[in-house]
């Protein structure tokens, strides 16, 4: 995880996995994604009982945070694949969860397009955060 690379542009919106993984707890779950060659290509964390719970009408949500793709593996489909597999992963390991929420920086149009492609919807809500204004997006999971 120490060799994970992010560009300066990526670091405007996210953090290194090595920093985020230190927050791991029974409610903050780091997720690492590997390709077929066993290279770490994507990282994110899923958090229960999070600060964005008030921005959804669903009672059981996970917050998707710190999503990134190692710069050496950008534009190869790994981020899309990881997000498209997420509902099945959550159904298996968190069957009580009914939605996934995230906050994406309003200036990060690349990430917004990715999340939209993967069926996340703009909730219309905006939140002021450490690195700027966040657009709250949500993916409602079918049961």
What are these regions (language model features)?
Residues 33-34, 135-139:
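Short beta-strand element of the conserved SAM-dependent methyltransferase core
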Residues 47, 101-103, 123:
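Solvent-exposed beta-strand sheet faces enriched in polar/charged residues
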Residues 63, 68, 101-103, 136:
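Conserved beta-strand segments that form the floor/walls of ligand-binding pockets within enzyme
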Residues 80, 106-124:
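Conserved active-site alpha-helix within GNAT-family acetyltransferase domains
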Residues 96-112, 128-133, 140-141:
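Conserved beta-strand-loop-alpha-helix junction that forms the acyl-donor binding cleft
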